[in-house]
């Protein structure tokens, strides 16, 4: 998952996708690595029941040479990652989630409100993506080809 600086949207998306099911390896990066995950982001995610990671943000170069089933970009600026990762990605998926800190907000309550609104939008859209693109691939399969519990045995 790629965003501008791996400090807000990408981390939120990682936790949200991981909450939908097992079997996924979800990594995050920014076009440029930011300094640290913002406290308000951690607070909102923890309020929604996530054990939020405060690991240091990293940049796209960390993952550029690896093979990926999906590279998910979360803002138009992050789409430039395709130039760096061509040939090692099976599918690119783009979202356009607004940066809650764009324009420089200094009032703490307003920051939290914007991050909470972003969380709600991301959760809805990422669930739809998971349901339509990933869920079927991650479900256990029986030897008969059924992807849910069957009565073969």
Question: Predicted segments — roles?
Answer:
Residues 5-7, 76-79:
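Short glycine-rich anion-binding loops that position phosphate/pyrophosphate groups of nucleotides
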Residues 11-13, 38, 79-84, 104:
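Short glycine-/acidic-enriched loop or helix-start segments at secondary-structure transitions
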Residues 68-69:
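Local beta-strand N-terminus motif with an aromatic residue
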Residues 81-142:
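Phosphate-binding/catalytic loops
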């Amino acid at each position: 998952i790629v965003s501008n600086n791996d400090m807000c949207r990408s981390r939120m998306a990682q936790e949200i996708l991981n909450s939908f099911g097992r079997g996924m390896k979800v990594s995050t990066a920014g076009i440029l690595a930011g300094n640290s995950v913002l406290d308000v982001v951690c607070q909102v995610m923890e309020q929604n029941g996530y054990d939020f990671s405060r690991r240091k943000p990293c940049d796209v170069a960390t993952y550029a040479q690896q093979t990926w089933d999906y590279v998910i970009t979360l803002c138009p600026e992050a789409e430039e990652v395709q130039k760096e990762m061509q040939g090692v990605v099976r599918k690119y998926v783009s979202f356009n989630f607004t940066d809650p800190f764009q324009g420089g907000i200094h009032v703490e309550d307003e920051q939290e409100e914007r991050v909470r609104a972003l969380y709600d939008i991301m959760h809805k859209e990422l669930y739809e993506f998971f349901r339509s693109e990933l869920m079927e691939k991650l479900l256990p399969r029986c030897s008969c080809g059924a992807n849910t519990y069957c009565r073969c045995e």
